[in-house]
């Protein structure tokens, strides 16, 4: 197999993840997009490791070992990220990134909502969508 196929697929996956990070407003979807970008990097690491091991006689599989390490770090990152998003959602009532720009600690002067009211059911449904 040519090196171009996994490299193009990796570039497409990374571009899709980058679009998701830049365009999405929901924090969970942003985390999913970051994971997609990490998987694109992992695919690239394995593809180049296999391609380079064809030319080298003594192969160390360092790209595959680095990929396993990256997968373990990504699993920890997504667990911590989801825990943070869940805690923010419980405290603020939304996971919309634009509404969470001002996350200062302490009581808000206007109350929990932007207009002094509690978050509505539609805002909570939007945060989970």
From Swiss-Prot:
UniProt keyword annotations, A-Z: Cell membrane, Membrane, NAD, Quinone, Translocase, Transmembrane, Transmembrane helix, Transport
Ranges for region Disordered: 98-129
Record has Acyltransferase as a keyword: no
Catalytic activity: a quinone + NADH + 5 H(+)(in) = a quinol + NAD(+) + 4 H(+)(out)
Keyword Repeat in annotation: no
Biased composition, class Low complexity, residue ranges: 111-122
Transmembrane segments: 3-23, 28-48, 68-88
GO CC aspect terms: NADH dehydrogenase complex; plasma membrane
Enzyme class: translocase
GO MF assignments: NADH:ubiquinone reductase (non-electrogenic) activity; quinone binding
Classification via InterPro entries: NADH_UbQ_OxRdtase_chain4L/K (IPR001133), NUOK/Mnh_C1-like (IPR039428)
Principal location class: membrane
Enzyme Commission number(s) of this protein: 7.1.1.-
Membrane disposition: Multi-pass membrane protein
NCBIfam families registered for this protein in UniProt: PRK05715.1-2 (NF004320)
Subunit structure: NDH-1 is composed of 14 different subunits. Subunits NuoA, H, J, K, L, M, N constitute the membrane sector of the complex.
Family: Belongs to the complex I subunit 4L family.
Function: NDH-1 shuttles electrons from NADH, via FMN and iron-sulfur (Fe-S) centers, to quinones in the respiratory chain. The immediate electron acceptor for the enzyme in this species is believed to be a menaquinone. Couples the redox reaction to proton translocation (for every two electrons transferred, four hydrogen ions are translocated across the cytoplasmic membrane), and thus conserves the redox energy in a proton gradient.
HAMAP family given in the database record: NDH1_NuoK
Protein name: NADH-quinone oxidoreductase subunit K 2
Species whose genome carries this gene: Streptomyces avermitilis (strain ATCC 31267 / DSM 46492 / JCM 5070 / NBRC 14893 / NCIMB 12804 / NRRL 8165 / MA-4680)
């Amino acid at each position: 197999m040519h090196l171009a196929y996994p490299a193009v697929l990796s570039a497409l996956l990374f571009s899709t993840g980058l679009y998701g990070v830049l365009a999405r407003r929901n924090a969970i979807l942003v985390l999913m997009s970051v994971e997609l970008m990490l998987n694109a990097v992992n695919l690239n690491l394995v593809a180049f490791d296999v391609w380079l091991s064809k030319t080298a006689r003594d192969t160390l599989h360092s790209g595959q070992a680095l990929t396993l390490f990256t997968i373990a770090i990504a699993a920890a990152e997504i667990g911590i990220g989801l825990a943070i998003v869940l805690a923010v959602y419980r405290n603020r009532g939304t996971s919309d990134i634009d509404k969470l720009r001002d996350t200062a600690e302490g009581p808000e002067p206007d109350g929990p909502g932007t207009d002094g009211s509690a978050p509505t059911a539609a805002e909570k449904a939007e945060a989970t969508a």
